[in-house]
Design a protein with these regions (language model features):
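A short beta-strand-to-loop transition that corresponds to the Sensor-1 phosphate-sensing loop
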Residues: 1, 106, 179-182, 234-237, ...
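Amphipathic alpha-helical transducer elements in NTP-driven molecular machines
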Residues: 3-6, 69, 212, 216, ...
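A short beta-strand element within the Helicase C-terminal
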Residues: 8-11, 242-252
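Short, surface-exposed basic-aromatic patches at helix termini and helix-loop junctions that form
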Residues: 14-15, 193-198, 249
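A short acidic (Asp/Glu
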Residues: 6-7, 186-191, 245-246
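Conserved two-lobed SF2 helicase motor
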Residues: 222-240
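Conserved Helicase C-terminal RecA-like lobe
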Residues: 52-63, 107-228
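Inter-lobe coupling linker of SF2 helicases/translocases
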Residues: 1-124
């Protein structure tokens, strides 16, 4: 794995043969054809072994709670001006951003609202632009969605505890939970720790805000038998290029 840059790939080839590439910025496939083989997963699946097992996908659905329905109705009815000097299309764009955050978690949507309100209040008063009141109304509705009202979270909690899912929280059955939003990650980290009565070191989180050293330590711990970690909650930083499969076969 590498970042796609010619120089990065050249550095890997030079580990195998320091004389293969004279100029990391200027080389051809003929320079390296003797030291690497390119294969895709589809090519390897036909080799006659069972190294690549078929993945099983299940789509889980949950019915929205009353407070979630109320918040979504407020969101749908919301009309954003965005900025006195900007176009309405930008208001629609930000509303799409809010919608994605809302479907991630109330916490993620509230964070997006707070960031927008901070920018607006640096330029306007509440009377200058109606967006401030509109966003405050939506924020108030979202604050009423408690963890108990957060239907997706409650469904996740039920799944992890269910006999059908059969998760025993053993060292060889660890779980990776992905989320795009940092606030959702933080919410899950704190709430799952409480609701599953997990110790602090049994649940970890990882995001792009962390240093490479800290990220690598978490990945290494996740793959060790003796490590107490059972759940890893991660942002997109862990979606590619990390080996998390040694002690885990479940992704959420």
């Amino acid at each position: 794995p590498h970042d796609g840059r010619r120089e990065s790939f050249a550095s890997l080839m030079n580990i195998l043969d320091p004389t293969a590439i004279a100029n990391p910025k200027d080389y051809t496939k003929d320079d390296i054809k003797g030291i690497f083989i390119r294969r895709f997963k589809k090519d390897l699946k036909n080799l006659g072994d069972s190294s690549f097992l078929e993945r099983k996908f299940e789509c889980e659905r949950s019915k929205a709670s009353k407070n979630e329905e109320i918040a979504f109705d407020v969101f749908v009815d919301m009309k954003l001006q965005m900025d006195i000097n900007k176009t309405r299309n930008q208001g629609r764009l930000f509303k799409t951003h809010l919608e994605k955050a809302l479907f991630s978690s109330p916490a993620a949507c509230i964070k997006s609202i707070e960031n927008r309100l901070k920018k607006l209040r640096n330029k306007y008063t509440d009377d200058d632009i109606k967006d401030i009141n509109e966003l405050e109304t939506l924020k108030d509705a979202l604050l009423k969605i408690t963890p108990h009202d957060f239907s997706k979270y409650q469904h996740l909690l039920h799944l992890l505890k269910s006999s059908e899912y059969n998760w025993k929280a053993q060292s060889d059955d660890r779980i990776v939970i992905f989320t795009e939003r940092i606030e959702t990650m933080n919410f899950l980290y704190e709430q799952l720790k409480k609701d599953l009565t997990l110790k602090n070191d049994a649940i970890q989180k990882m995001s792009g805000d962390m240093s490479d050293i800290d990220q690598q330590k978490i990945v290494e711990d996740f793959g060790r038998d003796e490590s107490p970690v059972r759940i890893l909650i991660a942002s997109d930083v862990a979606s590619e290029g990390l080996n998390l499969h040694y002690k885990s076969h479940r992704l959420i």
